[in-house]
Amino acid sequence: MRKNQTASYQGNTIPWIEKLLETPIDDHRKNAVNLILAPYLINVRKVSYDAALNIINGWLSKCGELRQLDQDFNYMVRYALKYCAKNGNRPLKLETLKTKNLILYDLLKS
């Protein structure tokens, strides 16, 4: 990995994404699942589909305690996991998140 890249890998983990998995959020959950968590779990940590589904559903359950989920995320989570497995998508880098979704970035930095 080049020095100028912002993703900091420790084995098969990225610390800021691990922090996200431990941090329930009340908004931007769909973006977090599609652009960060599904690609991270499938293509970086390389957990199984079922394990990734359980991890994300557990995280969403904690998020739902802050603010009820607006919709049934089950289909969206399953689609995101299958899409990432098929296409090899990588999670957004933290710096890319800063430009694409500043609100989510700020939630993670606080």
Describe every region a protein language model picked out.
Residues 1-34, 40-110:
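Basic, alpha-helical nucleic-acid-binding regions used in initiation and control of genome expression
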